[in-house]
């Protein structure tokens, strides 16, 4: 019996944690500032497509359209070379092959 109660409690907590339901209708929610100037015009249509956001998502703020989010795998610039130099000492296999040639 105790095991069943623990499972039900864990299920209820998980459901509450992952729930995206909004407790208030959209008309009663306070309007959060979205930004200023041109950024606000860009964010509004994308945010309206997403529907009502959860409490936690509203606390984080607008994320913006996916095409405006930076992709860390496409790094360019001088910092890439600095990172390669900083982590070069870990590349034992390549260094061994270069030393033998």
Curated annotation (Swiss-Prot):
Q: Where is this site: Cleavage?
A: 40-41, 58-59, 75-76, 95-96
Q: Does the keyword Secreted apply?
A: yes
What does UniProt say on post-translational modification here?
Two different processing pathways probably exist in antral G-cells. In the dominant pathway progastrin is cleaved at three sites resulting in two major bioactive gastrins, gastrin-34 and gastrin-17. In the putative alternative pathway, progastrin may be processed only at the most C-terminal dibasic site resulting in the synthesis of gastrin-71.
Pro-sequence residue ranges? 96-101
- Sulfotyrosine is carried by which residues? 87
Q: What is its main location?
A: secreted
Family, similarity comment: Belongs to the gastrin/cholecystokinin family.
Q: What does this protein do?
A: Gastrin stimulates the stomach mucosa to produce and secrete hydrochloric acid and the pancreas to secrete its digestive enzymes. It also stimulates smooth muscle contraction and increases blood circulation and water secretion in the stomach and intestine.
Keyword Amino-acid biosynthesis belongs to the record: no
Source species of the chain: Homo sapiens (Human)
Query: Which sequence positions carry the modification called Phosphoserine?
Result: 96
The UniProt annotation puts the region (Disordered) at 22-82
Query: What are the subcellular locations of this protein?
Result: Secreted
What's the superkingdom here?
A: Eukaryota
Protein name, entry field: Gastrin
The family database entries (InterPro entries) matched by this protein are listed as:
GAST (IPR039236), Gastrin/CCK (IPR001651), Gastrin/cholecystokinin_CS (IPR013152)
A Gene Ontology cellular-component term: extracellular space
Record PTM Pyrrolidone carboxylic acid, positions in chain: 59, 76
Changing residue 86 to D does what?
Answer: Small increase in ratio of gastrin-17 versus gastrin-34 production. No change in ratio of gastrin-17 versus gastrin-34 production
The primary gene name is GAST
Keywords assigned: Amidation, Cleavage on pair of basic residues, Hormone, Phosphoprotein, Pyrrolidone carboxylic acid, Secreted, Signal, Sulfation
Q: Which GO terms describe its biological process?
A: G protein-coupled receptor signaling pathway; response to food; signal transduction
Q: List-wise, which residues carry Phenylalanine amide?
A: 92
Molecular function as annotated in GO: hormone activity
User: Signal peptide: which range, if any?
Assistant: 1-21
